[in-house]
Amino acid sequence: MAKQTFEMTFEGRPLVVEVGQVAKQANGAVVVRYGDTTVLSVAVMSKKMATANFFPLQVNYEEKMYAAGKFPGGFSKREGRPSTDATLTARLIDRPIRPMFAEGFRNEVQVINTVLSYDENASAPMAAMFGSSLALSISDIPFNGPIAGVQVAYAAEDFIINPSASDKEVSHLDLIVAGTKEAINMVEAGAQELSEDIMLQALLKGHEAIQELVDFQNYIVAAVGKEKAEVELFQVDADLKAEIEAVYYDQLAKAVQVEEKLAREAATKAVKEEVLASYQERFAEDEDKETILRDVVEILEQMEHAEVRRLITEDKIRPDGRRVDEIRPLDAEIDFLPNVHGSGLFTRGQTQALSVLTLAPMSDTQLVDGLDPEYKKRFLHHYNFPQYSVGETGRYGAPGRREIGHGALGERALAQVLPSVEEFPYAIRLVAEVLESNGSSSQASICAGTLALMAGGVPIKAPVAGIAMGLISDGTNYTVLTDIQGLEDHFGDMDFKVAGTRLGITALQMDIKISGITPAILEEALAQAKVARFEILDVIESAIAEPRSELAPTAPKIDSIQIPVDKIKVVIGKGGETIDKIIAETGVTIDIDEEGLVQIFSSDQDAIDRAKTIISDLVREAKVGEVYTVPVVRIEKFGAFVHLFNKTDALVHISELAWKHTEHVEDVVKVGDMVTVKIIKIDEKGRVDASIKTLLPKPEKNEDGENGEEHRHCCCSHHKPDHHNESVEAPKKSDESETKE
């Protein structure tokens, strides 16, 4: 195929698609140019059905550092494992694409997106989502798209589609919505406590833009699309299914209605094992034994799926006996752990999450280096899902895509209520440990995170709670479920997570298994979630009504001091020598920003005070008129040097020692004497003159109107020589040995 180019203008930027020039051996490939962002999207499919009992779809999103004119970090100086942002973007693309393949499709499919050129004002993730859908749509892969996605911002009471970098800075909303021309099928959002009405408007506004992008894709597919390949779909033997249903359906249906999770799992497992054992014995010598047994396992899964959905839609009975809008039993507890900076334990039915708070100096913020300009990330929310939480053994290691995604959702939900750096100058890390799970563990981690933040004394604006909504739909009728458990998530059509405060929504995430949902379903789910959210907030606030006024004793305390910018180098010292010495002596952590704000962290207040005094002395400057009680550190013929602070000394000229004539400096002061002096002069070089006599009573004048002694031996200050320049004179800044005397 020769290169073909298609172009439209979308939201004020050119959107150009090139087909037929690159990656021609793949099933489908497109180059998408949006503004100055360029993404190559490629789709490939295996020739045969995979043996897995699921659809093996893999979506990758690769950020090449050259796309932004940047050099990769690290020793190898090349791209390594995907960044967290790249992993989250891959999930964003996967989620709206996955429902668009036929039931029973088991061929392996890979969709690879490579960012080749990056423009921060033209969304690369949205270009990649568009390119992924289009690469699948023009290929011979049987994909029931196209889909598209857009980013929506909200500022000045207006919605902005695919906002620029400057638009994002002032936006109260960061929403990504994807779908087909007919309906929405994926949502991901962070919001600053926006109402359900505004969120719904944003979703509908985004869907309008999606329709325009889908039309453009359909136009391209009509021009260059390949005929779809004939692939084998996984199907069970119809006669075998009818036979098993006739004998075992009622038995399995009864097991499904056992309310407690572990007991229900044991009951359904017993039925399935009985059926499987029967057919293993029956077909022990059959050459198609493996295929038959595989079908038996799939049929039993389909039977359980059908009965759970029938109970909810027809009988309005949920597996655990709840009403469709009923939340499982709730419990909230703080201070579960000693010696940490804050902890919260949240339990909802058989789902339980422990959240642990750690506070640290701002120097511990995470440095994020991707295609965007490098920045520091202050708040981290990490989510861990060990296999024991569901009573199973399994792999332990680095977090997978699911854990990264759930952690990011909690981070978005809670970030909206955190105090500013000016109000609370700490780096903040929350770790959610899922201890038990029967669905909605990500939302439990948000609730536990709220408890940990408030218990740890972080002055959040308001508590945040999260709830997961579900959907069972037969295409005509539907039922929206509040607080879905694992079985309802597994066999249901939607997982719609809503987090927020009493004022509004802070995060949304929606995944579905059908092609899309209507605005009416969205509206009902949001309204039902609001009621549930308030009920959960009541329980959270019964455990702790507001953030504690003080940090935990183990948490680092903080004090700050503002220093002149030109004094930063004084505090740091050559090669960091001075600041390292302060840290070693006091045990504190010190952060200094480019504007001279010095922040001192330690769990020991005395250590903070010592460090603050040292720094204050380092940058302190004497002022005319100030009075000090200080030691004499040096004697010269022309006067005495006194140590004011740090490395700053002052000269008390011999004429400023006393009102009467002084023949020898030692007649008045000696090294080591503590004297009270007043600063009388600071010259243009910063040299300091002080006086003792100005603080003493002045002698009465004689009959001639003069002070007798002073008149006979006049040594007036305005005529006295500049002894600061004499070779025997110690400099204004004494060495450290003198300072310590």
From Swiss-Prot:
- Does the record's keyword annotation contain Lipoprotein? no
Residue ranges, compositional bias (Basic and acidic residues): 698-713, 723-741
Provide a GO biological process annotation.
mRNA catabolic process
Please write the reaction equations for the catalytic activity of this protein.
RNA(n+1) + phosphate = RNA(n) + a ribonucleoside 5'-diphosphate
What are its GO cellular component terms? cytosol
Q: Which cofactor does it need?
A: Mg(2+)
Q: Which family does it belong to?
A: Belongs to the polyribonucleotide nucleotidyltransferase family.
User: What does this gene product do?
Assistant: Involved in mRNA degradation. Catalyzes the phosphorolysis of single-stranded polyribonucleotides processively in the 3'- to 5'-direction.
What name does UniProt use for this protein? Polyribonucleotide nucleotidyltransferase
Q: Which organism is it from?
A: Streptococcus thermophilus (strain ATCC BAA-250 / LMG 18311)
Provide the gene name from the record: pnp
